[in-house]
């Protein structure tokens, strides 16, 4: 595997997230309904748009991404973002899955008032993203400011017929989380959920 610096890997990951999740048309590629893009076309279009992209760089980003944001097709000819899409070109068909008792959502404290009014909504994305552990949710929340972890009563939601899915990288997905299924983060540190 070729050597790339952290900035180059992070910049490439952000670029891939942008074109494979949100705006494939920005460089002239088309994704299929499952989010797949032909790798040769992606590289060519990225280079035409002025972005340095090679197969070796793609391989490194896919292999080293701690969040496993991207995956290759079984034949190695296509790549996709595993989840997080806002483009209408993509509608990945995830298998429905029974969630654990609790899941977690990391957000910033500045968003709490809005969440208390409307719950968690997907916004521009297709799904609300949830984590199986608080540490991951805290990292997600920290991207937006002072992190706050909301506990989602996932099994209670599932018992009421609200579906959940899990992406290849372990991220849990659901369409929305009503306020009644949220536990607010005003518990002492270290308190365990039953």
Curated annotation (Swiss-Prot):
Domain of life: Bacteria
UniProt cross-references to SUPFAM superfamilies, sorted A to Z: ADP-ribosylation
UniProt cross-references to Pfam families, sorted A to Z: PTS_2-RNA
Keywords for the protein's UniProt record, in alphabetical order: NAD, Transferase
Enzyme class: transferase
Task performed by this protein: Removes the 2'-phosphate from RNA via an intermediate in which the phosphate is ADP-ribosylated by NAD followed by a presumed transesterification to release the RNA and generate ADP-ribose 1''-2''-cyclic phosphate (APPR>P). May function as an ADP-ribosylase.
Protein name: Probable RNA 2'-phosphotransferase
Organism in which the protein naturally occurs: Escherichia coli O45:K1 (strain S88 / ExPEC)
Gene name, Swiss-Prot/TrEMBL: kptA
